[in-house]
């Protein structure tokens, strides 16, 4: 079973780091949010990291079998 971690763009263009209902924090810069959530996911593998943009785009960044 994989764990799912999310970086979600907010209306104010900040980036929210989340796992399930748990919000970890918010970042001003996408790269900072990705670095943070990737570290969390790496500690809880198997895990997948998704980036959700305001334009409804979703990208999978980190997947484990």
Task: Give residue ranges: language-model regions.
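Short aromatic-glycine-(Arg/Gly/Cys) micro-motifs in beta-strand/loop hairpins
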Residues: 1-23
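Surface loops and adjacent helix of pleckstrin homology
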Residues: 20, 29, 63
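A sequence-level detector of short linear motifs
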Residues: 25-26, 60
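A short, charged, amphipathic alpha-helix used as a generic interaction element across diverse proteins
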Residues: 28-45
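Short, mixed-charge low-complexity intrinsically disordered segments
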Residues: 43-65
